[in-house]
């Protein structure tokens, strides 16, 4: 299973914010500069993360974005569920004549659930805390 770039960059944005000193705000422009992704794409990602409560956006002169909850409270599986369309096959009976007897969708559904359950074992904090090589790559100290 390959995650979409939307989910990939959503996770990267959260990793960047979690790597910053506690309470430090960043900007969408700063995140896009770090990862080389388009600003428009990142705005859409941050908006969805904000609606889900993972990111807090503050407007104004001293505004910016930061994590909306502690990194230890953000499970990676939950973020993927929020950002990723998880339908692996299109099982519409008008497109596939074996749909009434097909067991593939059930098998794939179980595989996706196993994937997400494994990701639920990790929090954002698990990915960033005391990760000096990551901080150096992100130029965060």
Curated annotation (Swiss-Prot):
Keyword Ribonucleoprotein annotated: no
Binding of [2Fe-2S] cluster, residues: 91, 96, 102
Example of a GO biological process term: negative regulation of DNA-templated transcription
InterPro entries documented for this protein: TR_Rrf2-type_CS, Tscrpt_reg_Rrf2, Tscrpt_rep_HTH_NsrR, WH-like_DNA-bd_sf, WH_DNA-bd_sf
Known cofactor(s): [2Fe-2S] cluster
Domain HTH rrf2-type: 2-129
Cofactor: binding comment: Binds 1 [2Fe-2S] cluster per subunit.
Keywords: 2Fe-2S, DNA-binding, Iron, Iron-sulfur, Metal-binding, Repressor, Transcription, Transcription regulation
Pfam families: Rrf2 (PF02082)
GO MF terms held by the record: 2 iron, 2 sulfur cluster binding; DNA-binding transcription factor activity; double-stranded DNA binding; iron ion binding
Cellular component terms per the entry's GO annotation: cytosol
DNA-binding region ranges: 28-51
Function: Nitric oxide-sensitive repressor of genes involved in protecting the cell against nitrosative stress. May require iron for activity.
Protein name: HTH-type transcriptional repressor NsrR
Species the sequence originates in: Escherichia fergusonii (strain ATCC 35469 / DSM 13698 / CCUG 18766 / IAM 14443 / JCM 21226 / LMG 7866 / NBRC 102419 / NCTC 12128 / CDC 0568-73)
This protein's encoding gene: nsrR
């Amino acid at each position: 299973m390959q995650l979409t770039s939307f989910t990939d960059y959503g996770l990267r944005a959260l990793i960047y914010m979690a790597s910053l000193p506690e309470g430090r705000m960043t900007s969408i422009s700063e995140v896009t500069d770090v990862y080389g992704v388009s600003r428009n794409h990142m705005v859409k990602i941050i908006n969805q993360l904000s609606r889900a409560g993972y990111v807090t956006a503050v407007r104004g002169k001293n505004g910016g974005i930061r994590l909306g909850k502690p990194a230890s409270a953000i499970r990676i599986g939950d973020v993927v569920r929020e950002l990723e369309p998880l339908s692996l096959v299109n099982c519409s009976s008008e497109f596939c004549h074996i749909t009434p007897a097909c067991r593939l969708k059930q098998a794939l559904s179980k595989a996706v659930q196993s994937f997400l359950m494994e990701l639920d074992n990790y929090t954002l904090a698990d990915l960033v805390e005391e990760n000096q090589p990551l901080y150096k790559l992100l130029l965060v100290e």
